[in-house]
Regions:
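Minor-groove-contacting beta-hairpin "wing" of winged helix-turn-helix DNA-binding domains
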Residues: 54-60
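A short, conserved structural fragment
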Residues: 43-52
Length: 78
């Protein structure tokens, strides 16, 4: 099945925003998303490298903003 990977990435980013938490390294989110989407988000500079032993991933400043925008667009009521 063909699908729009940009839409998948936007939804993955919005879901990362849903489980966002702050620690001493900044905004982090649990990385239980499809690896392909996580790799694309990393290539776009929106998250840190997901290939680590950590169970969470760091969002860049740009990624944090994009995640909130995607979350509000996809999941909030009008």
């Amino acid at each position: 099945m063909d699908y729009d990977t940009d839409k998948v990435d936007e939804a993955a980013l919005a879901l990362l925003y849903l489980n966002l938490f702050e620690d001493r390294w900044g905004a982090r989110a649990w990385k239980s998303m499809p690896w392909e989407a996580m790799d694309r988000l990393h290539e776009k500079g929106l998250i840190g490298d997901p290939k680590s032993k950590a169970k969470s991933v760091v969002l860049s400043e740009e990624g944090l903003i994009a995640a909130e925008v995607a979350f509000r667009k996809l999941f909030t009521s009008p």
